[in-house]
């Protein structure tokens, strides 16, 4: 194998290792991990679409007492036409945990970030 092939293989293995090591947290635990790339798994207690088209999947309680939100911006909402299906279901949300108005959230821009357990 030449050097370029070995380097490419090494890069792929490292990337796969990092992805496999993504931490998994509950809605309550997410607040302790702001800034991390992670997966949050919990029950969706409330679903709402704003007048502007943003979708909110609230976990760990209903709004405004939720512990975590999976936020789907208007620009991505068209990919989640049946978003009501998540209410009452346990889901996993993957992405970077951020803090918005004192609550942890992950911005979801692709269906691959959100799965029903």
Identify what each model region corresponds to.
Residues 1-2:
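N-terminal secretory signal peptides that target proteins for export/translocation
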Residues 5-14:
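Sec-dependent N-terminal signal peptides
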Residues 18-117:
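OB-fold and OB-like single-stranded nucleic-acid-recognition modules
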